[in-house]
Amino acid sequence: MKNEAEMQLDEKQENAVMAAVRNGIMILTGGPGTGKTTTINAMIEYFHSENMEIMLAAPTGRAAKRMTEATGWEAQTIHRLLEVNGNPEEDENPNRNGFARNADNPLETDVIIIDEMSMVDLPLMNALLTAIVPGTRLILVGDCNQLPSVGPGSILKDLIASECFPVVMLTRIFRQAQESDIVVNAHKINRGEPVLLDNKSRDFFFLKRQDPNVIISVLLTLIQKKLPKYVNAKPYDIQVLTPMRKGLLGVERLNSILQEYLNPPEPGKAEKEYGDHKFRVGDKVMQIKNNYQLEWEVCTKYGMTIDKGLGVFNGDMGIIKNINTYEETVTVEYDEQRQVKYPYAILDELELAYAITIHK
C-alpha cells in the first residue's frame, strides 16, 4: 500500500476513483505525468479495503512489468490473464476465442484494471469482454493520444468518442513529471506548440545532422559510448526508433549496421542465415506476428522447468540465447525469463530489433 503522502489526489483523480467505485465500467485517460498511476493505486487501495478481488493486466509483458513495479501488485499480460490455449482466429466456438478464460469459464474477480489500453486491438478486447461476467468492475486506463494498436481497431479512442461510458481525463502535469522535458514536450506537441530545445536538459536532446551516414556515425557513438556513460544503460537497453522500414535510415539498414557494431561475428558464436536476415547469439530480436501455438518455459539455472505456457505476440522483444544446428532451433529469451525455441522453419516470425519503427 502507498502511504498517505504519496496518495494525495487532486479533484479529477478523486472523481476518477469515485467513477470506478460507482460504475461497472469507466475509462481513465491522460497524457504522461498526469497521475494515472497514482489514481490506479488509489483505486486499488479502496477496492482492497473492501476485500474485493483485483486483477491487473496490460497488453505487453513490458507494460505489465511496469504496472507491477508502479503498483506493488502483480500484473500480467491480457493473454496470460485469459490463459491463451489456442489460436482465436481458428477457434470455431465464439465463446472460447482460443482462450481458457471465456464465456463458459469466465474470470473470477471483482475488479479488472487494464493499463496501456491504446495498445489493445479489437480481437483481444473481444476476448477480454467475453470472459467478464456481469457485476465485475472494468477500469480501462491509457493515453488516447498515443498511436493506436498494431492490430485492427482504435479501441480506447473509439470508446471515449462514443460517450457511452464515464470518462475522466487527467490534464494536470504533476511537479515531478514537470522535471522531465520528455513529458513537457509531449504535451507541447499535443497542443501544437514548439518544443523546448535545451542543451542542459537531462532527458531530451536534439542533434541536428543532415547526411545519413553522419547520422549513423553519431548514433553509434551515442549507443556505444555516450549514453551508457550518461544514463548508465547497456547498449541493449537503448532502443533506436525510425519512421520507416526502407531507405538509408530505415529499420532494415539500421539493424544490419547496428548488429555488426553491437554484436559482431566471433569464432564460436553461433549464427543462422534466414532469407535476408542473419541471426546471431546475443542479438536483440522481435516477434512480428501473433503465434498462439509457440510454447515458452521458464527454467532454473539447472534446467528445471518452473513455469510454462503458450503464446508469443506481435511486438514481444527478447535476446537470442542459443542456436542449435542439430535441433535446427533458435532459442529466444523474453521478459520474465520466458524461453522459446523457434524451429528454423518459422524464423520469418522474428526480425532484428536494435532499430524498430515508431509504430512498433
Question: What spans do the regions from the language model cover?
Answer:
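Pre-Walker A segment
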Residues: 1-31
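P-loop NTPase nucleotide-binding/switch module
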Residues: 2, 6-9, 14, 78-110
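Conserved nucleotide-binding/hydrolysis modules and their immediate coupling elements
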Residues: 5, 121, 256-260, 264-360
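Conserved helicase motor core of SF1/SF2 NTP-dependent helicases
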Residues: 19, 27, 46, 50-52, ...
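Conserved glycine(s) of the Walker
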Residues: 35
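Hydrophobic positions on the alpha1 helix immediately C-terminal to the Walker A/P-loop
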Residues: 39, 43
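Conserved helicase motor core of P-loop NTPases
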Residues: 144-310
